[in-house]
Amino acid sequence: MAIKKEFCIMKNNYPMWANYRFTGSHKHHIFGAAYRKKSDEDGLVIFLTPEMHNMSNQGIHFNRWFSDYAKKEGQKAWMEYYGKSKEEFVARYGHNYLED
């Protein structure tokens, strides 16, 4: 079975995450809940091992530092890829994750 190619603007950050789907990987939306669809549309997804997703205490769903780091990297990637400002990011995603 072929691995499905998915749109992702995130930089590869091994061993934390990949920017491509790999066998057994879990897809994680950088900005979930109300922003999940926008994350998909904008390529703000990463691919994780099950342990780094939600199958251990180190997983992004249980590790605040990891989640915050991914959000910061996601905001930087979005601003760079789309040539947009912090204000435009906040208008789309509701929050600035970068230090001023």
Residue ranges of model-derived segments:
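Conserved catalytic motifs of the protein kinase core domain
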Residues: 23, 44-45
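Polybasic, low-complexity binding patches
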Residues: 36-44, 54-100
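Cysteine-rich micro-motifs
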Residues: 46-50
